[in-house]
Swiss-Prot record:
Family (UniProt): Belongs to the histone H2A family.
Assembly, per entry: The nucleosome is a histone octamer containing two molecules each of H2A, H2B, H3 and H4 assembled in one H3-H4 heterotetramer and two H2A-H2B heterodimers. The octamer wraps approximately 147 bp of DNA. H2A or its variant H2A.Z forms a heterodimer with H2B. H2A.Z associates with the vps72/swc2 subunit of the SWR1 chromatin remodeling complex. Also interacts with rbp1/DNA-directed RNA polymerase II largest subunit.
Protein name as annotated: Histone H2A.Z
Gene Ontology biological process terms in this record: CENP-A eviction from euchromatin; heterochromatin formation; nuclear-transcribed mRNA catabolic process, non-stop decay; regulation of transcription by RNA polymerase II; silent mating-type cassette heterochromatin formation; transcription elongation by RNA polymerase II
A molecular function GO annotation: structural constituent of chromatin
A GO CC term attached to the entry: euchromatin
Post-translational modification: Acetylated once deposited into chromatin.
Residues modified to N6-acetyllysine: K5, K12
Function: Variant histone H2A which can replace H2A in some nucleosomes. Nucleosomes wrap and compact DNA into chromatin, limiting DNA accessibility to the cellular machineries which require DNA as a template. Histones thereby play a central role in transcription regulation, DNA repair, DNA replication and chromosomal stability. DNA accessibility is regulated via a complex set of post-translational modifications of histones, also called histone code, and nucleosome remodeling.
Phylogenetic placement of the source organism: Eukaryota, Fungi, Dikarya, Ascomycota, Pezizomycotina
Region entry Disordered, spans: 1-32
Positions with biased composition (Gly residues): 1-13
InterPro entries on file: Histone-fold (IPR009072), Histone_H2A (IPR002119), Histone_H2A/H2B/H3 (IPR007125), Histone_H2A_C (IPR032454)
Encoding gene (name): htz1
Length: 138
């Protein structure tokens, strides 16, 4: 019954192709968790002059994004673990990013509620140490 709404072959309903295998997404083929299709759509929409975007380019960009996210989350998780808490906050993200030299140069954005890095100027430390020495000598 061609053209009807009966059980017919085709379409994405069963998610199987002609050989009976289930379809795999680009992300699954590349072994990624992030969605390659969505990244490709963003790349196509955000390029000038409606340039074409290859499938491999989208997979590559997705892999880079996934790697950077995993790196930041690992460092932020370590920062949270050091502070003996179980939830990653913007403060932990700030400490993780600013603590790593390469991520610090890559991510120059201001993180909301991230705070500042704990740092005391050397000139101030020298004055405090000199006062302690003077008190101990006297």
């Amino acid at each position: 019954m061609p053209g009807g709404k009966g059980k017919s072959v085709g379409g994405k309903a069963g998610a199987k192709d002609a050989a009976g295998k289930t379809q795999k997404s680009h992300s699954a083929k590349a072994g990624l968790q992030f969605p390659c299709g969505r990244v490709k759509r963003f790349l196509k929409n955000n390029t000038q002059n409606k340039m074409r975007v290859g499938a491999k380019a989208a997979v590559y960009v997705t892999a880079v994004l996934e790697y950077l996210t995993a790196e930041v989350l690992e460092l932020a998780g370590n920062a949270a673990k050091d502070l003996k808490v179980k939830r990653i906050t913007p403060r932990h993200l700030q400490l993780a990013i600013r603590g790593d030299e390469e991520l610090d140069t890559l991510i120059r954005a201001t993180i909301a509620f991230g705070g500042v890095l704990p740092r005391i100027n050397r000139a101030l430390l020298l004055k405090v140490e000199q006062k302690k020495k003077n008190k101990s000598d006297a």
